C-alpha cells in the first residue's frame, strides 16, 4: 500500500511540474487567440512598471536582471526612473540564464521574479504550493 501511495505522489508531482512549466505558454496562446497578437516584451515592461510603481515606489534603487535581448528596450522604457520624485533609480544588468520573458528585480528589500511566467505561477498558486511542499 505504501508503494502505491509513493508512486501516486511521485506521479502527481511530475504532472504538477509539467503543468507548471507548460501552463503559462498555453495561457499566452489562448489570450493570443482571443485578443489577437501581442508583444511579450510589452507585457514584460508592463509587469516591471507595475511592480516598481506598486511595491518599490520608495526604494532608492532597483536592479533589473534580464536577458541580453531585452536590455535596450527596458533601458529606453525606464530611462526616466532616475531616483527623483519618489521613483527608484532603475539599473539594468544582463543575465544569460534568463529567457526573454523573464526578469528578476533586485532591491534593498530582496529580489522577485517579474516575468509573465512567474506572475502566472503566482496567480495560479503554484509558488505557494511549492513553498509549502504540498501537491
UniProtKB/Swiss-Prot annotation:
<dbReference type="GO" id="GO:0005829">
    <property type="term" value="C:cytosol"/>
</dbReference>
<comment type="function">
    <text>Component of the type III secretion system (T3SS), also called injectisome, which is used to inject bacterial effector proteins into eukaryotic host cells. Acts as a regulator of the HrcN/SctN ATPase activity.</text>
</comment>
<dbReference type="InterPro" id="IPR010586">
    <property type="entry name" value="T3SS_stator_protein"/>
</dbReference>
<comment type="subunit">
    <text>The core secretion machinery of the T3SS is composed of approximately 20 different proteins, including cytoplasmic components, a base, an export apparatus and a needle. This subunit is part of the cytosolic complex.</text>
</comment>
<dbReference type="Pfam" id="PF06635">
    <property type="entry name" value="T3SS_SCTL"/>
</dbReference>
<protein>
    <recommendedName>
        <fullName>Type 3 secretion system stator protein</fullName>
    </recommendedName>
</protein>
<keyword id="KW-0963">Cytoplasm</keyword>
<keyword id="KW-0813">Transport</keyword>
<comment type="similarity">
    <text>Belongs to the SctL stator family.</text>
</comment>
<keyword id="KW-0536">Nodulation</keyword>
<dbReference type="InterPro" id="IPR051472">
    <property type="entry name" value="T3SS_Stator/FliH"/>
</dbReference>
<keyword id="KW-0614">Plasmid</keyword>
<keyword id="KW-0653">Protein transport</keyword>
<dbReference type="InterPro" id="IPR012842">
    <property type="entry name" value="T3SS_SctL/SctL2"/>
</dbReference>
<dbReference type="GO" id="GO:0030254">
    <property type="term" value="P:protein secretion by the type III secretion system"/>
</dbReference>
Amino acid at each position: 500500500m505504501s508503494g502505491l501511495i509513493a508512486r501516486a505522489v511521485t506521479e502527481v508531482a511530475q504532472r504538477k511540474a509539467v503543468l507548471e512549466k507548460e501552463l503559462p505558454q498555453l495561457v499566452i496562446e489562448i489570450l493570443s487567440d482571443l485578443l489577437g497578437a501581442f508583444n511579450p516584451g510589452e507585457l514584460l515592461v508592463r509587469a516591471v512598471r507595475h511592480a516598481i510603481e506598486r511595491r518599490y515606489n520608495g526604494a532608492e534603487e532597483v536592479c533589473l536582471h534580464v536577458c541580453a535581448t531585452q536590455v535596450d528596450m527596458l533601458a529606453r522604457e525606464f530611462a526616466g526612473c532616475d531616483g527623483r520624485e519618489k521613483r527608484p533609480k532603475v539599473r539594468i544588468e544582463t543575465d544569460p540564464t534568463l529567457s526573454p520573458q523573464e526578469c528578476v528585480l533586485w532591491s534593498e528589500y530582496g529580489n522577485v521574479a517579474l516575468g509573465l511566467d512567474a506572475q502566472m505561477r503566482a496567480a495560479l498558486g503554484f509558488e505557494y504550493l511549492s513553498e509549502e511542499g504540498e501537491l
